[in-house]
Amino acid sequence: MSDSFYRYDVIVIGGGHAGTEAALAAARAGARTLLLTHNIETVGAMSCNPAIGGIGKGHLVKEIDALGGAMAKAADLAGIQWRTLNASKGPAVRATRCQADRNLYRSAIRRIVEAQPNLTVFQAAVDDLIIHNGAAEGDSVRGVITQTGLRFEATAVVLTAGTFLAGKIHVGETQYAAGRMGDPPATTLAARLRERPFAIDRLKTGTPPRIDGRTLDYTMMDEQPGDDPLPVMSFMGQVSDHPTQVSCWITHTTEQTHDIIRGALHRSPLYSGQIEGIGPRYCPSIEDKVVRFADKTSHQIFVEPEGLDVTEIYPNGISTSLPFDVQLALVRSIRGFAQAHITRPGYAIEYDFFDPRGLKASLETKAVGGLFFAGQINGTTGYEEAAAQGLLAGLNAARHVQALPAWSPRRDEAYLGVLVDDLITHGTTEPYRMFTSRAEYRLQLREDNADLRLTGVGRAMGLVDDARWARFSSKQEAVQRETARLSALWATPGNALGREVVDTLGVPMSRETNVLDLIKRPELSYAALMRVPTLGPGVDDAQVAEQVEIGVKYAGYLDRQRDEIARQQRHETTPIPEGFDYAGVRGLSMEVQQKLERVRPQSIGQAQRIPGMTPAAISLLLVHLERARRSQVA
């Protein structure tokens, strides 16, 4: 092998959702990138539920897509049931979700990875990092060492190890080391990382038993068909990309199910003290649900097919680590599951994660230069949260190599910005999941405008290809043309257009009205307006029509939110230098000093969001920073 085989700009460790997006982003941004995975066959694998998107999560997928990422494209190629959640509510909380064929999804991701220029994939487990100990500039990463002793060099490394760092599986009283069922853990790497100055703790997650769908009685369940017409996930996607569509089903646990679980809690690793890690609040195990909601006589279960060519079913809602004999009994007590055959047991898995307050907004670690963390190791849960972090870390790893400034979106620019800011400012003690409720500016952060918010900046950083840019530019121009066309037209009670509007739509008109303003009426939409002969048929592109309507109907709310953002931004981006001496700021209490020292915020905005931070403390910081700036100028 030539020396170039061992030397890269960026190395990504791990081929899951964070790792693949990180490697693809680094390569698109111009870095010669190596993706190391313990098994090439599992690149892009969906380890838990076979679904992409949902409330908050779908927003992240759209943002990944707007920045040129792969997740939405793969979802379009693998989605076997599609739904728009909150379809009857406002655009800020509408979310796209697809049930995915896990084999089609994995294949789609692998094809995208293998077709990406600048990106090499190599199968190897990583046991250690090569760290340069610089006396003056601090520690920095220089590469990795594999299990077989190969040394790969790079000036930026992205670690996306998922649940593999010291992973331990629990099924009842049985426990053993694993990264997920069937895969070995990264035990040596975990031990090496514990020797470094990182704050490390344990989290846990779980997965339900898988069921042979041929052994279920669907007549006892409620069918849940997908939407018609079908949505798409990617801005570049088409309905024709989707494979064959199928239904999901809904059933429920019974009182017998709950009795079985209560009678076996003493054998649950969750309640025996065997598991130390904290699990995800919003995806609790069935044991947790039965204990925490003791008054409920049943819990809903979504019966989700794992793919078109397999018989396995994913019973969403019964994640468990109970012993297998208990799993079998509880499964067969569920409506329609009396004859169920379990193909794989459910289990819980504990793993190492790093306190994300040890990260910069770029996801570079504060302790080791050039080392980036992304995904579950930062305390998050979910494919979408991992993929979004991976894209950001991969991009910034490439920019680190190229000596370019790091980039991270603000809270008012992207859910990705909310995610990262929450993590690096507040940290987390339980797996973090994205919800629309976490964003204070969610009317600005809609699925439908992810491209408008992020594609321009993505293009400037090399993430967006020519085809996407051309289509995005065309959409923008079409929105502007249609908005201008309608705003130039006026309807009055006496003119022909006004009479057409009244006759066609049955709406009253007492004074001269701009046609565009008609969309602001609650009972009217762009589609309704286009039924007026003089105005129709309108634009063919549904995305363009949607942007025109939302831009008009919510103009007042959007303007007020933009004003609020402008006020908040006054000091948001004021930087705080690395190594800033908080003890030198006169008037800061010891409590505030300790909080600032622990988080080490990179900006005044981040400092403001530290729990317990006072307006007085922020004022003192601003005064001190301004004095320092003036003394440097002088």
From Swiss-Prot:
PROSITE patterns (alphabetical): GIDA_1, GIDA_2
Quaternary structure annotation from Swiss-Prot or TrEMBL: Homodimer. Heterotetramer of two MnmE and two MnmG subunits.
GO annotation (BP), single: tRNA wobble uridine modification
Designated name of the protein: tRNA uridine 5-carboxymethylaminomethyl modification enzyme MnmG
InterPro entries associated with the record: FAD/NAD-bd_sf (IPR036188), GIDA_C_N (IPR049312), MnmG (IPR004416), MnmG-rel (IPR002218), MnmG-rel_CS (IPR020595), MnmG_C (IPR026904), MnmG_C_subdom (IPR047001), MnmG_C_subdom_sf (IPR044920)
Gene Ontology MF terms: flavin adenine dinucleotide binding
Binding sites annotated in the UniProt record for FAD: G14, G15, G16, H17, A18, G19
Annotated NAD(+) binding sites: 279-293
Highest taxon of the lineage: Bacteria
Keywords noted in UniProt: Cytoplasm, FAD, Flavoprotein, NAD, tRNA processing
Origin organism lineage: Bacteria, Pseudomonadati, Pseudomonadota, Gammaproteobacteria, Lysobacterales
NCBIfam families: mnmG_gidA
Keyword Protein biosynthesis: no
GO CC, any one term: cytosol
Role this protein plays: NAD-binding protein involved in the addition of a carboxymethylaminomethyl (cmnm) group at the wobble position (U34) of certain tRNAs, forming tRNA-cmnm(5)s(2)U34.
